[in-house]
Curated annotation (Swiss-Prot):
Subunit structure comment from the entry: Interacts with UvrB in an incision complex.
UniProt-recorded name of the protein: UvrABC system protein C
Residues covered by the UVR domain: 215-250
Subcellular location: Cytoplasm
Gene: uvrC
């Protein structure tokens, strides 16, 4: 078997690099950086493409470690020329959103701050709090990230009390609504007792709360209440009155003293150290603080450039009504006029961006900056603890470098049933939940009454690293997906099974793998019969313990979910041709599966949508001895 020659990075092929750079024009546009696997790893914009791209490869140019690493991986450069800088800015935002290049992740998605998600992609949208943005469904809308998860949950709780919303992701019963419907808390979504169109109107009202348009919603409801009262529809008027009272209670404590209370404005500021910048964005609508969002970025640029990138990423998914008329910034932005023009086009009205110098607006920026400083201090304390733990772990295991990415694996089952595995990831000592994975064990020898943790772990590791075994040329240096350390929950036996499979895949030399036994927190290394001599209270051991406990928690929760789904599954699901809608028709007619079992084919055929042929198939399913 032959393999294609590996493409050298451009930094190792000066002639090809210079030829490629000379092809790039000195015009505004967007550029792409690709690695040896043809993946887009970075997207940028510039008013002069050639000089900007050349700067990445210039000796002595002031580059951060992250950007220097990126430049070493680049094997191809592409570009798109635009007429104006504003067009380049808008195009860059769309392309970053589409491709999500690794080195473009300026805003760290460490799931520290929660979002509110509204699933507009569904007929009956759900509203829930999440710490992970799923980018696959463009119709779904995310609001946040919010700094105060407790306040966010309270707002959502009150919103669900004010408006009748679906309370469950899945129906509790197949043939009738649950108690929430009887209490007026849900309009009976599970039984489609409300049309999707009417329900979406209700959800849109809740969306206005998270868009900072609470006062606008109150005005709309007040007008509806007056019309209902004039029509002598006092029951509807009373319900709307209660909704207005609930909405006013949401904003009663959020008043901010500002001039021009009718003007919507955002205020953004940051506080940073050599590594990170903590950014706070306050959303003020009609004089009320309706949202306080937080971001974490790397401090590899000037403060104004960081603020601009945050604003670009924040507003690129915003609806026009969510863009404020004024944006107050702590530092001048490098391309403030261009960003203002882009936002003006999106909003359809004038948007201004400026740095306030005095009076109330300047005091507002100072308040936002103080909040950013408090968040930075909290983050530094946490970072010091984790840095100390990774240093200690590197010393314990004699690692050449601090372990940046550590992966932990665990197996969960009950006597072999519903066997699953977890893969959790810690980045610089912190859980990176966006990188978590779970696996359903496929090994046919793992069945009810017969568990095999060794074989299960071997299967999971093989599935995790299969692409690297199949393609030895796949880049590992600088690859964010490649772990610096693997920890297995278990003892010598579990570790041995993983070592064996990594040897078979020719990957053992490139991976450091250990196991952590629950008893006495013992660390085992490959080929060693005795555990390392460590103190259970050492920072490095405590880090491994946190990783092990998190892997166990994630595995157990997924196992419980699998068991719950299996228990909820109806016997009707096993009948070919009997979809969800027909199942609902059957249960509505017969009230239970037991009555369906007792019915004759002719009685089953009386159900709307069930013909004689399907009725016979249903009867035969419950009476196999009849065949």
């Amino acid at each position: 078997m032959t393999t294609s020659a590996q493409i050298l990075p451009l930094v190792k092929d000066p002639e090809r690099l210079e030829a490629r750079l000379s092809e790039i024009p000195p015009e505004p546009g967007v550029y792409f950086m690709r690695d040896g696997s043809d993946r887009i790893i970075y997207i940028g914009k510039s008013r002069k493409l050639r000089s900007r791209v050349r700067s990445y490869f210039r000796e002595g140019y002031n580059k951060t470690e992250r950007i220097a690493t990126m430049a070493k991986l680049v094997t191809e450069i592409e570009f798109i020329v635009t007429d104006t800088e504003a067009e380049a800015l808008a195009l860059e935002a769309n392309l970053i959103k589409q491709h999500q290049p690794y080195f473009n992740v300026l805003l760290k998605d460490d799931k520290k701050y929660p979002y509110v998600c509204i699933t507009w992609s569904e007929d009956y949208p759900r509203i829930f709090i999440t710490r992970k943005r799923q980018l696959g469904k463009e119709k779904d809308k995310y609001y946040g990230p919010y700094t105060d998860s407790g306040l966010l949950r309270e707002i959502l709780r009150i919103s669900k009390r004010i408006f009748a919303l679906r309370q469950r992701p899945q129906p509790l019963f197949k043939d009738r609504p649950c108690l929430n419907y009887d209490l007026g808390r849900c309009p009976g979504v599970c039984q489609q007792l409300i049309s999707p169109e009417e329900y979406r109107k209700t959800v849109q009202k809740v969306a206005m709360v998270f868009q900072g348009r609470t006062q606008e919603l109150i005005d709309i409801l007040s007008e509806q209440m007056e019309k209902a009262a004039e029509a002598l529809n006092f029951e509807v008027a009373a319900r709307i009155r209660d909704q207005i009272a609930g909405l006013k209670s949401l904003t009663a404590e959020q008043k901010v003293s500002l001039p021009d209370d009718t003007v919507s404005r955002d205020a953004i500021a940051l506080a940073g150290d050599a590594q990170h910048a903590c950014i706070q964005l306050f959303q003020i609508r009609a004089g009320q603080l309706v949202g306080r969002l937080a971001f974490v970025a790397e401090s590899h640029a000037e403060p104004g450039a960081i603020l601009q990138r945050v604003l670009e990423e924040h507003y690129q998914t915003a609806e026009s009504v969510e863009i404020p008329a004024e944006i107050l910034v702590q530092h001048e932005l490098p391309d403030a006029e261009i960003l203002a023009d882009v936002l003006t086009q999106l909003k359809g009205r004038k948007v201004t961006i400026f740095t306030p110098q005095r009076q109330v607006k300047a005091e507002l920026i100072e308040m936002v900056e103080r909040n950013a400083q408090y968040e930075l201090q909290r983050m530094q304390k946490l970072g010091d603890r984790n840095h100390q733990a990774t240093q200690d772990l590197a010393a314990i295991l004699d690692l050449p470098n601090l372990p940046h990415r550590i992966e932990g694996y665990d197996i969960s089952h009950i006597q072999g049933s519903n066997a699953v595995a977890s893969q959790v990831v810690f980045i610089d000592g912190l859980p990176a939940k966006q990188n978590y994975r779970h696996y359903k064990i496929k090994n046919p020898t793992v069945t009810i009454g017969h568990s095999d943790d060794f074989a299960s772990l071997a299967e999971v590791i093989q599935r995790r690293f299969r692409k690297y075994a199949e393609d030895p040329q796949l880049s590992r240096v600088g690859n964010p997906d490649w772990p610096d350390l693997i920890m297995i929950d278990g003892g010598k036996g579990q570790l041995s099974s993983v070592v064996t499979v990594l040897q078979e895949m020719n990957l053992l030399e490139d991976l450091r793998v250990i196991s952590l036994a629950k008893r006495r927190e013992e660390i085992f290394l490959p080929g060693e019969s005795q555990p390392l001599k460590t103190d259970a209270e050492q920072p490095g051991v405590q880090l491994l313990r946190r990783l092990r406990d998190e892997a166990h928690r994630f595995a157990v929760s997924f196992h419980r979910q699998q068991r719950s789904d299996k228990l909820k599954r109806s016997r009707l699901d096993e009948i070919p041709g009997l979809g969800h809608h027909r199942q609902k028709q059957m249960l509505a007619h017969f009230r239970s599966v037991d009555y369906i079992r007792q019915a004759t084919p002719s009685q089953i055929a009386e159900v709307p949508g069930i013909g004689p042929h399907l009725a016979q198939a249903i009867y035969d399913y419950f009476h196999p001895s009849h065949l």
